[in-house]
Swiss-Prot record:
Residues 6-98, 121-220, 229-325 form the Ig-like domain. GO terms for molecular function: immunoglobulin receptor binding. It comes from the Eukaryota. PANTHER family: TAPASIN (PTHR23411). Glycans are attached at residue 180. Disulfide bonds join 27-82, 144-204, 250-308. The gene is Ighg. Transmembrane segments: none annotated. This is Ig gamma-2A chain C region, A allele. InterPro entries: Ig-like_dom, Ig-like_dom_sf, Ig-like_fold, Ig/MHC_CS, Ig_C1-set, Immune_Resp_Modulators. The lineage of its organism: Eukaryota, Metazoa, Chordata, Craniata, Vertebrata. Keywords: Disulfide bond, Glycoprotein, Immunoglobulin domain, Repeat. It comes from Mus musculus (Mouse).
């Protein structure tokens, strides 16, 4: 897919009900490629009450949405702006959230539910974790999440389809969101590894009384080139050896697509004290990333064996491990 700039839509409440103590505003960023975009409210000065959902890929383009809940005394009397930046297309867009209609007045008999952005539930679909897809011993899951479900109409029907054939193996749970007294419904569909890798399409269809028509969301593995990563492990720099803790680095370069999983082990046991960067797009269209592991210097000096494990679809058996330990005398 080619680089595509996003369209940005400000979302104001369906009706101007300011009788409640709070109001929810939204911002929809649609039709962009590739990731990422950054979205802030009032250039980052407004961060409380913000709920930004992960980007969803559909028809080779991404869509992302964010909502912010503020007091009725804040908006519309004060300006609230959604700021969107898409580095890949050098796009920067600022959209001010304007009231619908010339004035903000209560609009009886219409009742505008305060927690419901756009007057009803929203639906998002998420891919399986890459490690679950590529490791045959694990179980990949596609997830459909329905948010802003009213407690007055909690009954949500979710149907699943694989290549338009209905399946009935999903498990669905409902959770209450304390921050705005709505319900969140999560439906998890276990899938076959090969179904995802071969590009089959997964669709969830959601119905609820608050929806004028069922909402459908689809997802599949993005098409594109595959290139195996190069993995390099780097010992702590000499300047760091005066400290109690030292840093081991795993550099992973030249891979496509960006979906990758990296973890550390010490003598075969999983390490927890590591941090990974997000994959970064390189100038040739491939991706690179870093992972750093903080360890006690004495463990490194005692020549413990540390390993950086990488899971990616371009690798033989989808997995590789690079191990190293301190060389005696250093």
């Amino acid at each position: 897919a080619k680089t595509t700039a996003p369209s940005v839509y400000p979302l104001a409440p369906v009706c101007g009900d300011t009788t409640g103590s709070s109001v929810t505003l939204g911002c929809l960023v649609k039709g962009y490629f590739p990731e990422p975009v950054t979205l802030t409210w009032n250039s980052g000065s407004l961060s409380s009450g913000v709920h930004t959902f992960p980007a969803v890929l559909q028809s080779d383009l991404y869509t992302l949405s964010s909502s912010v809940t503020v007091t009725s005394s804040t908006w519309p009397s004060q300006s609230i702006t959604c700021n969107v930046a898409h580095p890949a297309s050098s796009t920067k867009v600022d959209k001010k959230i304007e009231p619908r209609g010339p004035t903000i007045k209560p609009c009886p008999p219409c009742k505008c539910p305060a927690p419901n952005l756009l007057g009803g539930p929203s639906v998002f679909i998420f891919p399986p974790k890459i490690k679950d897809v590529l490791m045959i011993s694990l179980s990949p899951i596609v997830t459909c999440v329905v948010v802003d479900v009213s407690e007055d109409d909690p009954d949500v029907q979710i149907s699943w389809f694989v290549n338009n054939v209905e399946v009935h193996t999903a498990q669905t749970q409902t959770h209450r969101e304390d921050y705005n007294s709505t319900l969140r419904v999560v439906s998890a569909l276990p899938i076959q590894h090969q179904d995802w890798m071969s590009g089959k399409e997964f669709k969830c269809k959601v119905n609820n009384k608050d929806l004028p028509a069922p909402i459908e969301r689809t997802i599949s593995k993005p098409k594109g080139s595959v290139r195996a990563p190069q993995v390099y492990v780097l010992p702590p720099p000499e300047e760091e050896m005066t400290k109690k803790q030292v840093t081991l680095t795993c550099m992973v370069t030249d891979f496509m697509p960006e979906d990758i999983y990296v973890e550390w082990t010490n003598n075969g046991k999983t390490e927890l004290n590591y941090k990974n960067t997000e994959p970064v797009l390189d100038s040739d269209g491939s991706y690179f990333m870093y992972s750093k592991l903080r360890v006690e210097k004495k463990n490194w000096v005692e020549r413990n064996s540390y390993s950086c494990s990488v899971v990616h679809e371009g690798l033989h058996n989808h997995h590789t491990t690079k191990s190293f330990s301190r060389t005696p005398g250093k």
